[in-house]
């Protein structure tokens, strides 16, 4: 894309979570970002001002609900309300990273299902569509009664590795049983077998690698996950793979949350290179030499144009 897009009824706005990605997306579509401001009152309350007319327009709001999660979520809800009251024709949320997605079910008694609560808030505020990327639990789509376009970064990540010509002895590794479908999609693209890390998690954010299902001896392994948070799972998996005879271990993910001890764990691990997307804006202190970032702007920009033109987006899911 990247050519100028001639439709005054298409507007793209950015909030504060990932302005750089929003600018890339707008450039891919071929329009300027809409004019708006996010400020705070003296008591910390959020104030949003839309600085141009959006009456009758089809508006796309770019906002990940990453850290600070609650601040970014409230910005989004207030923006949706402002757009609704300003008579936008449609309000389309482009949320590269859907926060609270890991709270998608009751794992213990008296727990909330916060992923559902967030869906309710977004919908009640007035959103008419959601475009998102690699939700931790795809069934969260069912929490919404508005259309959801759930994209994935497998093609983007697979292309990175296929262009590196890592040899014929590739194995794609899922760090847990829940990620097997994702690993299979990448393996099919790379024409490689898969392996699975069988692990048990004794408590939140603590992972213990138990066993490797599949042959990794003498292989170059690529671990693929949706989220890397404290990096306990991914680094223990890399260590287990090397101990099982893997010659090299690469890792990739859609959403680099990278909290707490993540950076030190990755730096000290046998991971050769960690490939992430820019679904979450990373501060400078979260960058190390092992990391490389790929942009999801072309994917999201293409999705916006297709939705706006009432064209099919199904090929973007593959």
UniProtKB/Swiss-Prot annotation:
Gene Ontology CC annotations of this record = cytoplasm; ribose phosphate diphosphokinase complex
Tell me which residues bind Mg(2+) 1: 136
Q: Where is the active site?
A: 199
| Pfam families on file | Pribosyl_synth, Pribosyltran_N
Q: What reaction does this enzyme carry out catalytically?
A: D-ribose 5-phosphate + ATP = 5-phospho-alpha-D-ribose 1-diphosphate + AMP + H(+)
Q: Which CDD domains match?
A: PRTases_typeI
User: Which residues bind Mg(2+) 2 per the record?
Assistant: 176
Localization terms from the record: Cytoplasm
Function of the molecule: Involved in the biosynthesis of the central metabolite phospho-alpha-D-ribosyl-1-pyrophosphate (PRPP) via the transfer of pyrophosphoryl group from ATP to 1-hydroxyl of ribose-5-phosphate (Rib-5-P).
Q: Please give the name of this protein.
A: Ribose-phosphate pyrophosphokinase
Q: Which organism is it from?
A: Listeria welshimeri
State which gene encodes it.
prs
